[in-house]
Amino acid sequence: MPKVEVKNGDLDAALKSFKRITSETEKAYKKHEFYLRPGLRKKEKEKAAAKKRNKYNKRRSFYY
C-alpha cells in the first residue's frame, strides 16, 4: 500500500504525489496483466512511438 506523508498540512501536494504513485502502480499492473508475444510487444511500442511523434509534430506545426 502506497504511503504519503503530509507535511505542514499541505494536503494538496500530498494528494498529488499519492495519485502519481498509484497511477504508476496501476500502469505496471496493466502492463503485466497478460503475456504479450515479443512481436506484438514490438508493434505496440512502435504504435506508441508513432502516436507520441504525431502529437509532437501537431504541437510543433501549430506555431508555424
UniProtKB/Swiss-Prot annotation:
<dbReference type="GO" id="GO:0003735">
    <property type="term" value="F:structural constituent of ribosome"/>
</dbReference>
<feature type="region of interest" description="Disordered">
    <location>
        <begin position="42"/>
        <end position="64"/>
    </location>
</feature>
<comment type="similarity">
    <text>Belongs to the bacterial ribosomal protein bS21 family.</text>
</comment>
<dbReference type="GO" id="GO:1990904">
    <property type="term" value="C:ribonucleoprotein complex"/>
</dbReference>
<feature type="compositionally biased region" description="Basic residues">
    <location>
        <begin position="50"/>
        <end position="64"/>
    </location>
</feature>
<dbReference type="InterPro" id="IPR001911">
    <property type="entry name" value="Ribosomal_bS21"/>
</dbReference>
<dbReference type="Pfam" id="PF01165">
    <property type="entry name" value="Ribosomal_S21"/>
</dbReference>
<keyword id="KW-0689">Ribosomal protein</keyword>
<dbReference type="GO" id="GO:0005840">
    <property type="term" value="C:ribosome"/>
</dbReference>
<keyword id="KW-0687">Ribonucleoprotein</keyword>
<protein>
    <recommendedName>
        <fullName>Small ribosomal subunit protein bS21</fullName>
    </recommendedName>
</protein>
<dbReference type="GO" id="GO:0006412">
    <property type="term" value="P:translation"/>
</dbReference>
